[in-house]
Regions:
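Active-site recognition of the HExxH zinc-binding catalytic motif
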Residues: 72-85
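Metalloprotease/metallohydrolase-associated module, dominated by Zn2+-dependent proteases
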Residues: 2-53, 58-59, 64-67, 87-214
C-alpha cells in the first residue's frame, strides 16, 4: 500500500472502540492532513509542520499497526504538533517539552477501558519517561506485540527457549544460548561466533539440525 490521505472519520476502523470521540475534537481544532502509509521499518508515524507550500500540519501513520499501537503512535504525533504550535523549532524533537506534552495528550485515554490491562500498565510505566519510539521500550513493545496479527513461525527472541534455533531477516541462523537481563546471548551456527540480541527482535523459528556447521 502506498500513501493514502484519509478522512478523519476513517480513523474509527484503526483505533480502539470509544477513542475516536476523544480524537475528533483535536482534529477539529487544527488543520491536519492525515495520511495512512505502508509499513516503514524505521518509523511508525511522522509529523511534519506547516510550510509556505503546504500550510497545514501533516501526520502519517503506518496502516499495518494494531489498533492500540496505532492510537499510541497517533497521540505521539499529536504531541509533536502541539510542541510545534507552542515552541516552533526552538526545542529538541523528543525533549522535555515533548515528553510533558505527550503525557498531557495521553491522560484522557487512560482508565477509560480503551486499552487492554497489560498494555495500559506498560503504557503508564512508559509515559513516566517516554522515549522517541515505543519500539525502544521492551515492556510496552512486548505488550503491544501480543495484539499484532500473528505471523506463523515467528517469535520474539525473549520468548524462545535456550537451545532453539532461529533465522534472522538476513537469513543467518542462530541458536539461543542464554537469556541475560536485557539481551540474549546467541551462537551463529555457521561461524560459531557469539552475538547479543535484544529480546524484542522478531525472528523466524527453524528446526534444530544435528551437528553444527562451525
Amino acid at each position: 500500500m502506498g500513501k493514502q490521505e484519509t478522512s478523519i472519520h476513517l480513523l474509527k476502523k484503526f483505533v480502539p472502540e470509544g477513542s475516536f470521540e476523544l480524537i475528533a475534537p483535536f482534529f477539529a481544532s487544527h488543520t491536519i492532513h492525515l495520511t495512512l502509509t505502508h509499513e516503514r521499518k524505521s518509523v511508525l508515524g511522522d509529523y511534519r509542520n506547516p510550510t509556505r507550500e503546504q500550510p497545514f500540519h501533516r501526520i502519517s501513520i503506518n496502516v499495518n499497526l494494531n489498533r492500540y499501537s496505532f492510537l499510541i503512535t497517533l497521540l505521539h504525533e499529536m504531541a509533536h504538533l502541539l510542541v510545534f504550535v507552542h515552541f516552533k523549532h526552538t526545542v529538541s524533537p523528543h525533549g522535555k517539552e515533548w515528553k510533558a506534552q505527550f503525557r498531557q495528550v495521553l491522560i484522557p485515554y487512560i482508565g477509560k477501558g480503551l486499552f487492554p490491562a497489560d498494555v495500559e500498565r506498560a503504557l503508564i510505566a512508559y509515559v513516566k519517561n517516554p522515549a522517541a519510539s515505543t519500539c525502544t521500550d521492551p515492556g510496552l513493545f512486548k505488550a503491544l506485540y501480543r495484539y499484532d496479527e500473528p505471523k506463523p513461525g515467528h517469535k520474539l527472541v525473549d520468548d524462545l527457549e535456550p537451545g532453539q534455533w532461529f533465522e534472522t531477516e538476513g537469513g543467518r541462523v542462530f541458536e539461543k544460548i542464554e537469556e541475560l537481563r536485557t539481551r540474549s546471548r546467541c551462537l551463529e551456527v555457521a561461524t560459531g561466533r557469539m552475538y547479543f540480541f535484544q529480546g524484542i527482535i522478531e525472528v523466524k523459528l527453524i528446526p534444530r539440525q544435528k551437528g553444527r556447521i562451525a
